[in-house]
Amino acid sequence: MAMQGIESQDWAWFTFSRVRVLRELADGRSERDAAERLGIAYSSVRSVVEELKNKTGLHSVREIGHWWRGQAGEWLAWCAEQAGAAQKGYGTGGD
């Protein structure tokens, strides 16, 4: 399973729409099940999966789901940093 590293500046490519699909795949769902749960067309999920394969260098839905389970926290930290929330402790109850 060859994976390309994602540089921090590449996290912007992972839109919320793509991440919603990634979450479903990480939970072990098929593309068809992901589409149904998200209320979007199967073809839309297929398009996202093909984009993800190109971006990550992975070859299967299962590999992508496994990869995302290891990357989601880093992406979330990047989002918090972009919003300025990482340094200020937003959401910790100590504002």
Task: Cite the ranges covered by each PLM segment.
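Short helix-to-turn junction characteristic of helix-turn-helix DNA-binding domains
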Residues: L25-R29, W68
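Recognition helix of helix-turn-helix DNA-binding domains
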Residues: S30-E63
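Short, Lys/Arg-enriched N-terminal segment that forms or immediately precedes the first helix
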Residues: M1-D10
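Helix-turn-helix/winged-helix DNA-binding modules
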Residues: W13, A26-D27, T56
